[in-house]
Curated annotation (Swiss-Prot):
Toprim domain segment(s): 81-167
PROSITE patterns (UniProt xref): RECR (PS01300), TOPRIM (PS50880)
Keywords: DNA damage, DNA recombination, DNA repair, Metal-binding, Zinc, Zinc-finger
NCBIfam families the record matches: recR
Gene source species: Campylobacter jejuni (strain RM1221)
Entry-linked Pfam families: RecR_HhH, RecR_ZnF, Toprim_4
SS bond list: none
GO MF term (any one): DNA binding
GO BP terms: DNA recombination; DNA repair
Lineage: superkingdom: Bacteria
Protein's name according to its UniProt entry: Recombination protein RecR
Family: Belongs to the RecR family.
The keyword DNA repair appears for this protein: yes
Zinc finger (C4-type): 58-73
Length: 190
């Protein structure tokens, strides 16, 4: 770090603490905002402050929201009979961007009795008929799915999980063996 530039060094350090930002990128960003475009720097500072102050988890599903209920939970056009279980609010952003799902969500960031009771209350209150698990493929997520399925087996629910397999545009030689195995075993007829 450069002596005598404590504020600049602190900004570089703050950027470098963010995911996927290395030191070189942090220096470029800090320089750009301090020297090349101070207006963008002020806007960024204002937007960060507002996001921290106003964005919170939706009280029902756990998605990012500026209100008690997020736009998804408040949307009357959504299919209120299906509930997609995800690991984080970021997963909701990804699924929404794909425009492949029109139901509700529930963020299961940790498996505990409080979360399970909240999930059960939502299922009963909204008369959910299907739980879709959109979790990262792992032994832990398989155990979580099995546990929830067993716990809620008396609620007349259909349980499903998102398909897994080979991503578009990837050569078979670059696919891990677990994904290739799943793709072969869960292939669809054409």
């Amino acid at each position: 770090m450069v002596k005598g530039l404590e504020k600049f060094n602190e900004l570089v350090e703050s950027f470098a603490n963010l995911p996927t930002i290395g030191k070189k990128t942090a220096i470029r960003l800090a320089y750009h905002l301090c020297i090349n475009n101070q207006i963008d720097g002020m806007k960024l500072a204002h937007n960060i402050e507002n996001a921290i102050r106003f964005i919170k988890p939706c009280e029902q599903c756990g998605a990012l929201s500026e209100n008690e209920l997020c736009e998804i939970c408040s949307d009357e056009e959504r299919n209120k009979n299906i509930l997609c279980i995800v690991e984080s609010p970021k997963d909701i952003l990804t699924l929404e961007e794909s425009q492949s799902y029109n139901g509700l969500y529930f963020v299961l960031d940790e498996l505990n009795e409080e979360k399970l009771e909240k999930l059960k209350q939502i299922i009963l209150k909204l008369n959910i008929s299907e739980l879709i698990f959109a979790l990262t493929h792992s032994i832990n997520s398989d155990a979580t799915i099995f546990f929830i399925e067993d716990k809620f087996k008396g609620l007349n629910l259909t349980f499903s999980k998102i398909a897994q397999g080979i991503p578009s545009g990837i050569n078979l030689e670059n696919v891990d063996l677990i994904s290739l195995n799943k793709a072969m075993n869960f292939r669809t007829k054409i």
